[in-house]
């Protein structure tokens, strides 16, 4: 018959056992909390980066990198929408060209998702500056992509109208109210 294991002794502040300060096989103590902090001593994406070694300058470089990653993710999102629109409008094109467009759209989507996950992991550093840089990057990328400054026509209303017209035409209907049958 098996004997039950004894409970560990309570910690200094209550009933819970003391938390380990180091993971087995790790040389660094676990000091990251689960609440947002302010300060330049953050670890973002890689061990000891930007960390404490280079001061505030490396921290600002880290914030600029997170901002750029988030802006690029938004720009790729706009490019993905543009590729989807091109695919919808190119039903009459050759099969080989359509397949290339589909592969390109899949590649853009994969790159966008990879960047989005990197930004998410950076925000998981629980540094408020990194969070603000990510939000600012997404906003800047959205603004640039929608304003057409990146050379994308995906934001232009006439393109959206053309896509709706192409979809309506392929369904056999028309968007113009005067072309509806009269009762």
Curated annotation (Swiss-Prot):
Protein name (record): Copper transporter 4
What GO cellular component is one of the record's annotations?
Answer: plasma membrane
Can you tell me where the transmembrane regions are?
56-76, 115-135
Which InterPro entries does the entry link to?
Cop_transporter
Pfam families per record:
Ctr (PF04145)
User: Can you tell which superkingdom this protein's organism belongs to?
Assistant: Eukaryota
**Region (Disordered), start-end ranges:** 1-21
Q: What does this protein do?
A: Involved in the transport of copper.
Q: Where in or outside the cell? A: Membrane
Q: Which family does it belong to?
A: Belongs to the copper transporter (Ctr) (TC 1.A.56) family. SLC31A subfamily.
Q: Does the keyword Transmembrane apply?
A: yes
Which key words tag this protein in UniProt?
Answer: Copper, Copper transport, Ion transport, Membrane, Transmembrane, Transmembrane helix, Transport
Picking any one GO molecular function of the record gives: copper ion transmembrane transporter activity
Q: Identify its membrane topology class.
A: Multi-pass membrane protein
